[in-house]
Amino acid sequence: MAKELKFSEDARSAMLRGVDKLADTVKTTIGPKGRNVVLEQSYGSPTITNDGVTIAKSIELEDHFENMGAKLVSEVASKTNDIAGDGTTTATVLTQAIVTEGMKNVTAGANPVGIRRGIEKATAAAVEGLKKMSHDVKTKDDIAQIASISAANKEVGKLIADAMEKVGNDGVITIEDSRGVDTSVDVVEGMSFDRGYMSQYMVTDNDKMEANLDNPYVLITDKKISNIQDILPLLQSVVQEGRALLIIADDITGEALPTLVLNKIRGTFNVVAVKAPGFGDRRKAQLEDIAVLTGGTVISDDLGMQLKDATIDQLGSANKVTITKDATTIVDGSGNKEAIAERVDQIKKAIAETTSDFDKEKLQERLAKLAGGVAVVKVGAATETELKEKKYRIEDALNATRAAVQEGFVPGGGTALVNVIPALDEVEASATGDEATGIKIVKAALEAPVRQIAENAGLEGSVIVNQLKQEKPGVGYNAADDKFEDMVAAGIVDPTKVTRSALQNAASVSALLLTTEAVVADKPQPADAAPQAPVAGGMGGMM
């Protein structure tokens, strides 16, 4: 296919238009008075959301060059979401601010490479400043405040704080639909491990890219499965029962995996395969944990067992299993309660006896998975559209809370980013030329989130930013109540990890955009260039 090329100013300005179109859509959602965005769906009712990454992923622009700019900003949002689980709108606002100001300077003749160095130095200094002002999460109230701000809902904050209290800060929390209109938290015994599905064709929910199995059998083995004949009798028994199957194995290779995938696609049976968690002796121990939890048996050479001889009685089972590309969560296993309690006691004894800190940590992880259970947040709403929107908010709040537990929290509402600006003065003083310009660009961009929060509240952003700079550190603008106050004392806080990731990812992609000198895109095909359908020949003998 023929390509279309743009260079220098033409290339950058086309991409900037795409950046602006996406960012202008996303930034309307930031802050307590941010608005929602309605997304058209190819089927079903439209989605109403204020989730930055969901909006960014749904935007596809007609102009190829503009679309590339938009997709780079979308990548910033996605990367921030992957790392911190929240802060995608902040990342988008920061990216637009850095790119817009940077483009002006590059157009005026500044060297983009020098500007890039300045952006990188300023970002590193700002991140250090954020870490220094960070507070540790100590109480249930801290967790509730962080979740409340992320979801813009105090009830959600309380729910998540309750869930984390029940299963611990490192516990597993999942989100499900409720049958009613109320949202509640239930704790169900369960286990999660960091292995996902072997093939994306095994997913059952294409929106979330996850596989959900209801009341499945669980085959647990430390063997490699390369020949489908080894498990064929077992598969036939499972099909006759009409139930789904989760296979946990050392690996599935050869023709076995494609055969499973093909039968899954055809609808012959519902199967998901995952690799066994851990390595060596720890793998064997974790497989035993899963077997005890599900009431199954580990099919292992150590026990002199062969896969082809395995029966359906040796399979475990569970009420529900959820598998993503990175993790598997088994909820409400069918294992014997006494056997589970006995296994928990064994692990507790091992923790007491071990002298290795590493071994102790791994044993405590196993104990939490076996005894801690899984907290299930059941989300209720009056309509399907409201349910989707509510789930997005709860997912963001949950991710933000986990991020805060890891790295602490800073004053919210964009206050921390403005407070960290003086930390860049020392770096700026030692820089010259275009590098100093890059640092100034970041200093200006750090004001952008507060500015946008104020504008979404119907105020003049510059006035709020200037007043904020006069206040002592930690005092910020509370857009919900339209007043300046101590943000931490008011419970308006952001996870340090979220704020840090948003800034780092925004700076990284912005620097790449500014140093772009040429853009190559597919040339649009003219409408009349579509190939004509061939006319059938050899029909002359027909009457």
Swiss-Prot record:
This protein's record includes keyword Mitochondrion: no
Keywords: ATP-binding, Chaperone, Cytoplasm, Isomerase, Nucleotide-binding
Principal EC category: isomerase
Main location: cytoplasm
Reactions mediated catalytically: ATP + H2O + a folded polypeptide = ADP + phosphate + an unfolded polypeptide
InterPro entries documented for this protein: Chaperonin_Cpn60_CS (IPR018370), Cpn60/GroEL (IPR001844), Cpn60/GroEL/TCP-1 (IPR002423), GroEL-like_apical_dom_sf (IPR027409), GROEL-like_equatorial_sf (IPR027413), TCP-1-like_intermed_sf (IPR027410)
Binding site for ATP: 29-32, 86-90, 413, 478-480, 494
Intracellular or extracellular location(s): Cytoplasm
Signal peptide (from-to): none
Annotated disulfide bonds: none
Similarity remark: Belongs to the chaperonin (HSP60) family.
Subunit structure, as described in the record: Forms a cylinder of 14 subunits composed of two heptameric rings stacked back-to-back. Interacts with the co-chaperonin GroES.
Annotated function: Together with its co-chaperonin GroES, plays an essential role in assisting protein folding. The GroEL-GroES system forms a nano-cage that allows encapsulation of the non-native substrate proteins and provides a physical environment optimized to promote and accelerate protein folding.
Protein name per Swiss-Prot or TrEMBL: Chaperonin GroEL
Top-level taxonomy: Bacteria, Bacillati, Bacillota, Bacilli, Lactobacillales
